[in-house]
């Protein structure tokens, strides 16, 4: 996909993610990989009114200039470079924050949308709806702390495609932009369902 097409995709999808409650108050992001570069939007920009001027492109191997515009530049770069990912989504939804309040991991089983989550490697297929899904949880902090915690927890959960950040939200990734989107839809559905079942 060309750089311009990816920019157009960001301009279309981020307002959509905003409408779902994933990216309120200028937070959250959708980051795409294009060869050795990453593309996302600036921090603290209204996600429902983004323009092409709000889009940032940075080198995956050198994010120092970009960090002032995108605080999570190092995190996005690491995920896109190390997790066989083409796209990642950072959501600060109410459901994700609620799911992040468990001790060490969010766990759910025997739910239909579990089958939308892959078994780690894209070639390994998908989970069954009767499987148990585990999403690890790390502590919140500055971007360096989150990245350090992310690296550690992925060593413990190498098959995961998402990590919750306590009191903050979730980051998820996929082998294509379509998979990152549909996987996050499944995660968000499961997070919200868990919350609603617990409040019955």
Swiss-Prot record:
Any GO MF annotation of the entry? methylthioribulose 1-phosphate dehydratase activity
Name of a matching Pfam family: Aldolase_II
Tell me which SMART domains the record gives.
Answer: Aldolase_II (SM01007)
Task: Give Gene Ontology CC terms.
Answer: cytoplasm
Which domain of life does the UniProt lineage start with? Eukaryota
What PANTHER family does the entry give?
Answer: METHYLTHIORIBULOSE-1-PHOSPHATE DEHYDRATASE, METHYLTHIORIBULOSE-1-PHOSPHATE DEHYDRATASE-LIKE PROTEIN
Provide the protein name: Methylthioribulose-1-phosphate dehydratase-like protein
Q: Which organism is it from?
A: Schizosaccharomyces pombe (strain 972 / ATCC 24843)
């Amino acid at each position: 996909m060309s750089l311009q097409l990816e920019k157009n995709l960001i301009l279309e999808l981020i307002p959509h993610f905003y409408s779902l409650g994933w990216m309120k108050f200028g937070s959250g992001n959708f980051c795409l990989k294009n060869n050795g570069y990453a593309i996302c939007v600036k921090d603290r920009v209204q996600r429902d009114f983004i323009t092409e001027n709000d889009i940032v492109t940075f080198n995956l191997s050198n994010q120092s200039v970009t960090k002032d515009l995108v605080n999570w530049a190092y995190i996005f770069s690491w995920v896109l470079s190390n997790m066989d990912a083409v796209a990642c989504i950072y959501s600060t939804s109410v459901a994700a924050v609620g799911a992040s309040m468990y001790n060490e991991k969010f766990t759910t089983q025997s739910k239909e949308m579990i089958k939308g989550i892959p078994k780690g490697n894209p070639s390994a297929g998908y989970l069954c709806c009767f499987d148990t899904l585990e999403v690890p949880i790390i502590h919140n902090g500055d971007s360096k702390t989150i990245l350090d915690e992310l690296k550690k927890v992925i060593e413990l959960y190498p098959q995961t495609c998402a990590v919750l950040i306590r009191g903050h939200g979730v980051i998820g990734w996929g082998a294509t932009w379509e998979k990152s989107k549909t996987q996050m839809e499944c995660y968000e559905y499961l997070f919200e369902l868990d919350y609603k079942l617990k409040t019955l």
